Regions:
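Glycine-rich phosphate-binding loops of nucleotide-dependent enzymes
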Residues: 2-248
Length: 248
């Protein structure tokens, strides 16, 4: 392999389900500190790609290396999470009866069992980290609010904050703005750019206006392979992409 120094390398990854190739010799490289957008029609392989990276699905063939040293194909999901890969699914999963602050406290890296954590006195370092996370996810004024009372967009931000509390190197985010208002969508683009100052991210999204707002390199998947890569303008002008999306 020739991707020395890359944070994540997928090389010729193939995944087959009952004879159907969900991923077909997929190759992709993510550099340290990069924010990458991944788009593609339904069935293009986006979810399967994230399943492979996180260990949920094992590839039939191919190379998958994280942080230049770790062969992810040999590790299970918990081990991959401990290495520093976090995943945000499309639907938010927060502890709705608890407050925003309590959700973040439970998620802090290295924290204790839930019952002890909620009743124990916060350490100064924990309080400081929670304050930082609240600022990042735009929920400082909602710290004592019940998570179940947040808007859909705010729940998405809270779950992103819960993942950040685990101190991942790489964050995989699946359709973060689905169901959001225009204002929340705009703030989410800002949020992900802020996170990208200290973390690498892969964002899977269908909303092209949101992808444009991110202003980053875009990878287009089609039939389990990379169809095109480039800026959003280059992607939208690519005849192959136009044919896949518009059928002409």
């Amino acid at each position: 392999m020739s991707d020395d120094g890359a944070l994540l390398v997928l090389e010729d990854i193939t995944v087959t389900f009952d004879g159907f190739k969900a991923l077909n010799s997929l190759s992709l490289t993510l550099e340290p500190g990069e924010l990458r957008a991944v788009i593609g029609p339904n069935g293009a392989g986006k979810t399967t790609m994230m399943d492979v990276i996180t260990g949920k699905t094992k590839p039939d063939t191919g190379v998958l290396i994280f942080d230049t040293l770790h062969d992810l194909t040999r590790l299970d999901e918990p081990a991959i999470a401990r290495l520093g890969i976090g995943r945000k699914f499309q639907r938010p999963t927060v502890f709705e009866p608890l407050s925003v602050r309590e959700n973040l406290l439970l998620s802090l890296a290295g924290n204790r069992n839930p019952a002890f954590t909620l009743w124990a006195r916060e350490k100064p370092s924990e309080r400081e980290r929670i304050d930082e996370l609240l600022t990042t996810i735009r929920l400082t004024d909602d710290r004592h609010r019940r998570a179940g009372d947040l808007s859909h967009g705010q729940k998405q931000w809270l779950e992103i904050g819960m993942l950040l509390a685990q101190e991942p190197q790489l964050l995989l985010v699946d359709e973060p703005v689905a169901g959001m208002s225009d204002a929340e969508t705009e703030q989410t683009a800002e949020l992900l750019r802020d996170i990208n100052r200290t973390r690498s991210l892969v964002v899977v999204e269908h909303d092209m206006a949101f992808v444009r707002a991110l202003g980053v390199k875009v990878t287009v998947l089609h039939e389990g392979s990379v169809l095109a890569e480039g800026s959003i303008d280059e992607i939208q002008d690519d005849p192959r992409v136009i044919e896949v999306y518009l059928g002409r």
